[in-house]
Regions:
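Short Cys/His-rich zinc-binding micro-motifs
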Residues: 2-3, 8-31
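Cysteine-rich micro-motifs
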Residues: 31-41
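A short, polar/proline- and glycine-enriched secondary-structure boundary/capping micro-motif
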Residues: 48, 123-125, 153-157
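Short, aromatic-enriched amphipathic alpha-helices that serve as compact interaction elements
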Residues: 49-63
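Short Fe-S-cluster ligation motifs
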Residues: 60-75
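Short solvent-exposed beta->alpha transition segments
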Residues: 72-100
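Surface-exposed, charged secondary-structure patches
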Residues: 90-127
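Short beta-strand edge/turn micro-motifs at domain boundaries
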Residues: 129-157
Length: 157
């Protein structure tokens, strides 16, 4: 059986650090493989089944600089025209981890995900704490709409 080859820009372990949707509760807590976790949405064209998986895949897309995926999963009414994510830029954040705090579906087409994303820029550690809102479109795909952001900054010693 041939194994799929990952492109040089794709990690083996998933940047989101979360459990792949098929993972069993109580299973070993090692990072899931990118191809089975967020890669199937970012590279495989599969639609995220819930806003939670979409949130995780969007975090991974920021880590990897997958701007096209971010645009495709952002509600066109709120997506910034100048969205461009380049993780190799000198002032780009270096993403350190994602923690999901809460996930709720208010109905079949509306959901929220509260998360904390840790990153560094210029020697300073940051925590992006956001309550994100998601909407399922007429095509059945979840999209990020907007969020309430609380950003904290701490000097690395």
């Amino acid at each position: 059986m041939n194994k799929p080859l990952l492109s040089p820009q794709r990690p083996v372990d998933c940047p989101c650090g979360g459990a792949a949707p098929a993972a069993r509760p109580g299973a070993a807590t090692e990072a899931p493989r990118f191809a089975q976790c967020c890669g199937r949405y970012i590279d495989g064209g599969e639609a995220a089944p819930r806003a939670l998986e979409l949130m995780r895949s969007r975090y991974s897309a920021y880590v990897l600089g997958a701007t096209d995926y971010l645009r495709a999963t952002w509600d066109p009414r709120t997506c910034p025209a100048d969205l461009d994510v380049d993780p190799t830029a000198p002032d780009a954040p270096r993403w350190l981890g994602l923690q999901i705090k809460a996930f709720a579906e208010s109905d079949a087409d509306h959901a929220t995900v509260e998360f904390i994303a840790r990153y560094k820029v210029g020697g300073r550690a940051h925590r992006l704490h956001e309550l994100s809102r998601f909407l399922r479109g007429d095509d059945g795909r979840w999209r990020y709409v907007d969020g309430d952001v609380n950003e904290e900054q701490a000097l690395i010693k």
